[in-house]
């Protein structure tokens, strides 16, 4: 079947595509994978700061920077690599875990702690935090700025049209 507006999975991918394009950065599958990586990295860093877990020593500043850069420089090709792993594992969150282990294997500190990536977590732990970050980021960067523009325009129109008489209406009827 050809890819067109009529064969889109939903109207959001079809006729409304141009209207929701700014949200793609926050709600695409790529975005979900990126947020999963962010959550897994944050969890691993938190474990390294936990003195009660002797098996994971506190990471050096260089290692923390490497982990942060993995998140900030996450690319489409990284996402595609995770999808290739997922094709083998049939598990989306496990694929992120395996990708992190492979990608960070050259770091001695992380290699020693590799089995603690995803430690004591369920997939839902990772997913619900990822979805929360998706919502938070989209609100901050797309939705609230758009609402601010709407409010500004309404205030402008209210001042501009304050002296214009209008017929009162109830349910669209005069």
Residue ranges and their predicted role:
Residues 1-174:
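A helix-coil-helix interface module used to build multimeric assemblies
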């Amino acid at each position: 079947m050809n890819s067109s507006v009529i064969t889109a999975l939903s109207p959001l991918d079809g006729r409304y595509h141009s209207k929701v394009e700014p949200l793609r950065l926050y709600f695409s599958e790529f975005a979900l994978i990126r947020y999963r990586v962010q959550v897994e990295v944050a969890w691993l860093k938190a474990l390294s700061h936990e003195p009660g877990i002797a098996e994971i020593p506190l990471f050096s500043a260089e290692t923390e920077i490497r982990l942060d850069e993995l998140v900030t420089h996450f690319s489409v090709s990284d996402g595609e690599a995770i999808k290739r792993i997922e094709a083998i594992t049939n598990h989306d969150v496990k694929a992120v875990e395996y990708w992190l282990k492979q990608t960070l294997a050259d770091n001695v500190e992380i290699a020693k702690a590799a089995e603690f990536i995803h430690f004591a977590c369920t997939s839902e732990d990772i997913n619900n935090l990822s979805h929360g970050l998706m919502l938070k980021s989209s609100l901050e960067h797309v939705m609230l700025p758009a609402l601010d523009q709407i409010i500004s325009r309404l205030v402008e129109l209210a001042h501009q049209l304050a002296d214009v008489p209008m017929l009162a209406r109830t349910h669209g009827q005069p």
